Amino acid sequence: MAKQVFQTTFAGRELIVETGQVAKQANGSVVVRYGESTVLTAAVMSKKMATGDFFPLQVNYEEKMYAAGKFPGGFMKREGRPSTDATLTARLIDRPIRPMFAEGFRNEVQVINTVLSYDENASAPMAAMFGSSLALSISDIPFDGPIAGVQVGYVDGQIIINPSQEQAEQSLLELTVAGTKHAINMVESGAKELSEEIMLEALLKGHEAVKELIAFQEEIVAAVGKEKAEVELLHVDAELQAEIIAAYNSDLQKAVQVEEKLAREAATQVVKDQVTAVYEEKYADHEEFDRIMRDVAEILEQMEHAEVRRLITEDKVRPDGRKVDEIRPLDAVVDFLPRVHGSGLFTRGQTQALSVLTLAPMGETQIIDGLDPEYKKRFMHHYNFPQYSVGETGRYGAPGRREIGHGALGERALAQVLPSLEEFPYAIRLVAEVLESNGSSSQASICAGTLALMAGGVPIKAPVAGIAMGLISDGNNYTVLTDIQGLEDHFGDMDFKVAGTRDGITALQMDIKIQGITAEILTEALAQAKKARFEILDVIEATIPEVRLELAPTAPKIDTIKIDVDKIKIVIGKGGETIDKIIAETGVKIDIDEEGNVSIYSSDQDAINRAKEIIAGLVREAKVDEVYRAKVVRIEKFGAFVNLFDKTDALVHISEMAWTRTNRVEDLVEIGDEVDVKVIKIDEKGRIDASMKALLPRPPKPEHDEKGEKSERPHRPRHHKDHKPKKEFTETPKDSE
């Protein structure tokens, strides 16, 4: 295939697509250039169906540091495991693509996005999402796309598509919306307490922009797209399916309607084990035994899936007996743990999360060194999901993509209400431990995080709560569910998480299993979520009505002082000598930022006060008219040098020592004497003049004689106008200065 180039303009930047030049052995590949960001996307498919009961799709987003002209960090100087941002971007691309493959498709598919050059003002993640859809669409892989995604901002009341970095910093909204040309199928957002109306408007305008990108993709597919390959889809034997449904559907229906999770799982497992045993015996010697038993398992799964959906759409009954807009029982607890800086335990039905707060000096902030310029991350929210939370055994180790994603969602939701660095100069870490799970654990972690922050004395603007909404749709009719549990998440069509305060939304996340949802469904889901959010906030506020005014006794205390930027080097000292000495003497921790904000941390307030005094002394500046108790450190003919404080000296000229004439400095002061002086002048070079006599009473004027006349002055000798006396040069103290 010869190289072809396609070009358009999108959101004020040039969008160029190149095909047929690189990675030609992949099923489909494209180079996407957006602004000066360049992403290579390659899509490949295995030749045969993979084993397993799920679609093995893998999406990678690779950040190459050379793309930003940077060296990788670390000893190896080579890219290693994906960064958190790269992992989140890969998930962001995976989620709108996954629903676009046929039910029963089991061939392994890999989509690899490599960032080759990076322009911080032209979104590489959005270029990668565009490239992923296009590479699949022009390939022979049976992908029912295209899809596209855009970033949406909200600045000065205006919705902006793919905002620049400067606009993003000013934006009240950080939204990614993706979908087909017909509907939205993925949402990820953080927001500064925006209303449901603004969020809906942003979603719909984002989708209009998505349609533009899809039209461009369709143009390219028409020009270079391959014919789709015919692949085997996983299907079950129709006769076997009819036989099992007729014999066992009523038993499974009864089991599904058991309200308590563990009891329901046990009841359905009894039915499944019974059916499995019957068919294992019946087909024990059959040459296709493995296929038949795979079909039996799949049929039972489909029966359970169908019954859950039927109950909700037809009978309006949920597996646990709740109404469609009803929340499970709620419970909130603070101070669950001693010694820690704050803790909250939140329970919603059989979902439970423990959140633990840790406060630390700003030196503990996380340094993020990726494709963007290096920056420090002050707030971290980490989410852990141990297998015991669902009563199972399983893998233990580093957090997976799901845990990273759920942690990031909670981080976005809570970050919007945190105090500024000036108000609360701490690094903040929340860790959510999921102790039980029956759906919506990420939202439970947000609620528990709010409890921990408030109990720990972090002055958040308002409490935040989260709720997960679900959807059951049969094409013509739909039902929106509030507070979905595990079974409804597994067999439902949507998982729409909404977090926020009473004033507005702080985070959204939506994943669906169908190809899109309408504005009508979004509107209804947001309205139901708002009602549920307020109910949860009622419980949180009843548990802890206000943020505590004091930190935990175990939390580090802090004091801050502001110094001039040019004084930072004085406090740090050569090679850190001065600051290290202060830390060693007082036992505190000290952080200094580039703007001269000095933060002093310790559990001992006296140590903080001592360190503060030392630093204040180091950066203290003399001021005109201020009085100091100074020490004489050097004597010259023209005056004495005195130390005002620390390394700051001043000159007291001999003429400023007393109101009477003095010929010798030593007649008035000696080295080591302490004297009171007043600063009278500081020149442009910072040299300080001080006066002793300015603090002394001024002597009275010469007295009058008895007649009230002034005493006569001694007469100066007069010289004849032609007489020129010999000039004598005498060095005065001021001349010698």
UniProtKB/Swiss-Prot annotation:
Enzyme Commission (EC) number: 2.7.7.8
Biased composition (Basic residues): 715-724
Region (Disordered) location: 691-737
Catalysed transformations (reactions): RNA(n+1) + phosphate = RNA(n) + a ribonucleoside 5'-diphosphate
MF-aspect GO terms: 3'-5'-RNA exonuclease activity; magnesium ion binding; polyribonucleotide nucleotidyltransferase activity; RNA binding
Domain KH: 556-615
UniProt binding sites for Mg(2+): D489, D495
Keywords: Cytoplasm, Magnesium, Metal-binding, Nucleotidyltransferase, RNA-binding, Transferase
SMART domains per UniProt: KH, S1
S1 motif domain location: 625-693
Gene Ontology terms describing biological process: mRNA catabolic process; RNA processing
Subcellular location: Cytoplasm
SUPFAM superfamilies, per database record: Eukaryotic type KH-domain (KH-domain type I), Nucleic acid-binding proteins, Polynucleotide phosphorylase/guanosine pentaphosphate synthase (PNPase/GPSI), domain 3, Ribonuclease PH domain 2-like, Ribosomal protein S5 domain 2-like
Pfam families named in the record: KH_1, PNPase, RNase_PH, RNase_PH_C, S1
Main location: cytoplasm
GO cellular component: cytosol
InterPro entries for this protein: ExoRNase_PH_dom1, ExoRNase_PH_dom2, ExoRNase_PH_dom2_sf, KH_dom, KH_dom_type_1, KH_dom_type_1_sf, NA-bd_OB-fold, PNPase
Extent of Basic and acidic residues compositional bias: 700-714, 725-737
Cofactor: Mg(2+)
PANTHER family in the cross-refs: POLYRIBONUCLEOTIDE NUCLEOTIDYLTRANSFERASE, POLYRIBONUCLEOTIDE NUCLEOTIDYLTRANSFERASE 1, MITOCHONDRIAL
Function: Involved in mRNA degradation. Catalyzes the phosphorolysis of single-stranded polyribonucleotides processively in the 3'- to 5'-direction.
Protein name from the UniProt record: Polyribonucleotide nucleotidyltransferase
